[in-house]
Amino acid sequence: MFSDNSHCPDCGQQWFPSLELGHWLYQTELVENECYQVFLDRINRADYCPECYPDNPANRSLVLPWSFPLEWAPQNLTRWTFEKACHPFLLGPPLVRKKIHDSRVAGFNPALQLILSRTDKTLNKKLGQSK
C-alpha cells in the first residue's frame, strides 16, 4: 500500500509519506471528497518524523499535547492514523472509538478531529453499527 522506502532518512524510524497517506484516506473514503484537499494541505509538509525535525512548523502542528494519551497517538500522526484506521479502531468496540473521538484534546486539533470522525463513521457504516 505504501512505498518500501517509508523511513525517516535521519533516524530510520518508519513513517508514511503524507501524500500517500492522503491518497489512501481518500480511496478508502475515510475523508470525504470536499475535505480531502484541506486534509492534505494540513499534513503535506510533515514528511519527516517530528523527533528528527522539531523545528518544522508542519510537524509542530501535528504533534499532539503531552497530556493526550500516548497509546492513542504517538508523535508521528501519519503513522498513528494508518495504524488506528486499519487495526485498533476496527477491532475496538464503538464505545471506545466514541470515547477517543469525543475527547477534549481531539476537539482542539482540526486534523485529528477530521480523521477520527471520518474513521468512526466509515467503520460504523461498514460494520453495520449505528450510533
UniProtKB/Swiss-Prot annotation:
This is Torsin-1A-interacting protein 2, isoform IFRG15. GO terms for cellular component: endoplasmic reticulum. Induction: Induced by interferon alpha.
